[in-house]
UniProtKB/Swiss-Prot annotation:
Fe cation 1 binds at residues 109, 144, 147, 232, 236. Its cofactor is Fe(2+). Pathway: Antibiotic biosynthesis. Residues 1-22 are annotated as: Disordered. It is an enzyme of class 1 (oxidoreductase). The gene is cmlI. This is Alpha-N-dichloroacetyl-p-aminophenylserinol N-oxygenase.
Amino acid sequence: MRDHTDEKSEAAGNDDGHVRIGGLPAFDPDDPAENAVINRLVGNWHRRAAVKREEPDVYALFDPGRPDFREDMIPFRGHPIWERLSDETRSRLLSWGWVAYNRNTVLIEQRIANPAFELVIGGAYPGLGGQQLELAVAQAMVDEQYHTLMHINGSAVTRRMRRSDFSDRVLPDSHITTIHQEHLDRCEEPWQRSLTTLGFATVAEISINAYLDLLADDQEIQVVNSTTVKLHNRDEYCHASISGEMMKQVYEALPADRRRFLLEKVVAGLEAFVAPDFTTWESIVAFEGVPGWEKAAAEVREAQGGTHLVQDHSGIHTLLTEMDVLDQVEFGWGTTVTR
């Protein structure tokens, strides 16, 4: 957990060579792509940073010949309908994939992670409290706002450079935020709502690295896209440790029935987090007017139902093992390897 009690210099270096300015994500001052993303995030960054030299902006880094997203992350990719698409339509679907990925990330931050942090600061959970925790959680909330802006910027770059709207209004709420809301709607007591959000947020904050890893180190997609995700990813390793400790402390302070309830919500959150978002992709191909999409969508759902887009479940597996409750939950861990 970061120590936020000491005064920080405006630009501070880390042992790994990354620089953190204020609340911005840590970045490599020698990496042009990372500098460009940070520069986009805060317009006057180059006047404040320790390294003051001209760096390319995000638009200069854009390569029209590179895909915006990973083709193998599109559910329709393995269906014959994909082979019948024109190169132009495939390219548009890959751009949509990046925009939808960003929107899902933003919705997770705004509707699940930050609401849980707000509940912590508001004293909703037993076993939690104290200045150090409040400072760490408040800083995490600031981080999440930067992450939100980074991903909104990421979509904005794609829209400008591809000269197309790719409007978020075309997209439904993401799968995990929809499932989270469904669980909230079934709650009858305030404690149920707060524990539901904690369960889903714990999954999101601990498993988000696995989701971001899907693009962070990809060498084929747009450099600015993978770099945006990479910068976000670094902060989330810290958030994972904070969320894991909060989960342990709250669980220990709960009576048996509420412990069971919380574990049920962790499993529900994990199932929603790792699943492919069929509804979003159906909305995309419908909007794009892909011929035969309805039949293809039904076949894809049947073939891929129960599969996991995010294959790495090790974060939650490790947490539940440390809590000595792994045998109390039912989840298809597959070949999960603990870290």
